[in-house]
């Protein structure tokens, strides 16, 4: 949305008949803070996760008041979803909640699994392609799709770097001119920057150089 090249025709077609919010702001970014906010229903300043690393990349612990099940287990969105908005309770005819995602592995964020009845890790740290994820989802749906009362979360990484479109797609934008704002001065400024997904690390980075 808002990009000058036609890189997402299917999403654009969907958007023509969908609601577009012009003044919406994410409460917590990027990936790890946003997922934790989604899971807990709380801002990062309250759940403890506001960064990808350091002391602010793990949920706050319950402390001395923690019971057998943690607050994450009792109040995470899968638990709330399964209980119609109420905290988790055992021995109920709950909605079955399932996640197919390598997010927890990629970010060492295993609190993401809290409240899910089933969790499937594709095992490639988010470098898997949609067909690999879909194969697991298709198998689960074949076995369970005809049942009632379930929620299936399927996480595909293809829109995320490194962008892995099939080779058959070619380079459809190779001959298109660059936008007018992209001057040599702008290019040099970005090139001198640093960090994951910057101009010099456009494909991301490996936490351990030996894994790169």
Feature-to-residue mapping (PLM):
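Catalytic domains that recognize anionic headgroups
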Residues: 1-212
């Amino acid at each position: 949305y808002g990009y000058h090249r036609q890189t997402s025709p299917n999403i654009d077609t969907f958007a023509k008949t969908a609601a577009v919010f012009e003044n919406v702001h994410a409460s917590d970014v990027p990936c790890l803070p946003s997922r934790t906010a989604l899971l807990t229903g709380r801002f990062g300043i309250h759940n403890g996760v506001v960064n990808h690393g350091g002391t602010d990349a793990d949920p706050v612990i319950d402390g001395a008041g923690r019971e057998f099940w943690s607050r994450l287990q009792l109040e995470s969105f899968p638990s709330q979803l399964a209980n119609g908005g109420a905290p988790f309770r055992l021995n109920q005819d709950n909605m079955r909640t399932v996640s197919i995602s390598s997010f927890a592995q990629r970010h060492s964020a295993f609190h993401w699994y809290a409240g899910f009845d089933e969790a499937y890790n594709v095992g490639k740290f988010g470098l898997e392609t949609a067909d690999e994820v879909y194969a697991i989802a298709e198998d689960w749906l074949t076995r369970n799709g005809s049942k009632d009362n379930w929620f299936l979360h399927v996480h595909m990484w293809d829109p995320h770097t490194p962008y892995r479109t099939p080779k058959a797609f070619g380079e459809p934008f190779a001959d298109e001119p660059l936008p007018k704002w992209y001057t040599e001065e702008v290019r040099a400024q970005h090139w001198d920057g640093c960090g994951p997904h910057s101009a010099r690390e456009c494909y991301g980075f490996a936490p351990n150089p030996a894994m790169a």
